[in-house]
């Protein structure tokens, strides 16, 4: 048997201090429902159940703290909770609960990420896809999000304007066309888009590869 020797309340949780010197963190609602107070005794079975519930509560709290910084993908959350030392089953249950409640949604995350990224800077689908893949979003979800956002194909006029600005900034430097192509690849534009822009530069600016 275990005896509760002290109870410390903070926000939505209670820390039970036992006569063994151990502390158990629980949701305040659980403690109220179990009618636990200082002097209460807890059986071994009850202790094990409380330990499990405490771990589950701490896992969910850690998840919400992580989400408070910014939205996360399912994969990011799983990796974070793993680093925090929670076991696989605990993480799976927590992630499933968060997904059911709408706190984790890779489709919504991808759509918002793409929209925010494009508002900040003109980039291509390859870069967007690579960034989302690093965050653990599946290829299927990424492809759908790019399509919905209209980012599957870049607007040639916009990319050309970006390339022309870069081209002019290079001044009389050699191999400006190659540098432009490399610049556009770094921005994540696909081969067809880069080819079209480079050809337009050659046509409208009269530039050659060996200049």
Explain the meaning of each model-derived region.
Residues 1-211:
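An alpha-helical, amphipathic repeat domain used for nucleic-acid recognition
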């Amino acid at each position: 048997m275990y005896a509760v020797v002290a109870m410390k309340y903070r926000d939505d949780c209670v820390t039970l201090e036992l006569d063994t010197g151990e502390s158990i963190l629980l949701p305040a609602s659980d403690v109220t429902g179990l009618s636990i107070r200082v002097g209460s005794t807890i059986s071994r079975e009850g202790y094990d159940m409380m330990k499990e519930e405490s771990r589950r509560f701490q896992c969910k709290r850690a998840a919400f703290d992580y989400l408070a910084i910014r939205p996360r993908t399912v994969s990011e959350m799983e990796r974070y909770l793993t680093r925090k030392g929670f076991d696989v089953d605990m993480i799976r249950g927590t992630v499933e609960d968060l997904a059911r409640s709408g706190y984790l949604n890779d489709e919504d995350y991808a759509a918002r990420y793409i929209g925010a990224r494009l508002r900040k800077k003109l980039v291509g689908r390859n870069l967007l896809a690579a960034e989302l893949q690093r965050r653990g979003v599946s290829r299927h979800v990424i492809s759908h999000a790019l399509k919905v956002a209209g980012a599957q194909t870049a607007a040639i006029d916009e990319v050309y304007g970006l390339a022309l600005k870069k081209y002019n900034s290079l001044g009389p430097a050699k191999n400006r066309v190659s540098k432009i192509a490399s610049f556009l690849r770094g921005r994540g534009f696909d081969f067809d888009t880069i080819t079209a822009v480079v050809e337009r530069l050659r046509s409208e600016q009269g530039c050659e590869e060996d200049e």
